[in-house]
Amino acid sequence: MGRGGGMGNPVNVGIAVQADWENREFISNISLNVRRLFDFLLRFEATTKSKLASLNEKLDILERKLEVLEVQVGSATTNPSVFN
């Protein structure tokens, strides 16, 4: 005959509690690592945007300088007396 309404074997309950704590710890570690990854990605995005904006400004400056040089070369080829 079995016992009715009991909590079951104390060893099984202890194993279940231990497994539950291990699962909670695992989930906590996963959550922490996901949060760290998310924080890293936010910082990476901000840094990347900043660096790309800086590079874009430098590229704009170089493009303007190139346009000026193209105009100077064009006027020099049509008017060689500029170099005399």
Curated annotation (Swiss-Prot):
The keyword tRNA-binding does not apply. It is found in: Cytoplasm, Cytoskeleton. One of its GO terms (cellular component) is plasma membrane. Promotes multiple, actin-dependent cell polarization events in the developing leaf epidermis. Involved in regulation of actin and microtubule organization. Part of a WAVE complex that activates the Arp2/3 complex. PANTHER family: PROTEIN BRICK1. Belongs to the BRK1 family. Binds SCAR. This is Protein BRICK1. The gene is BRK1.
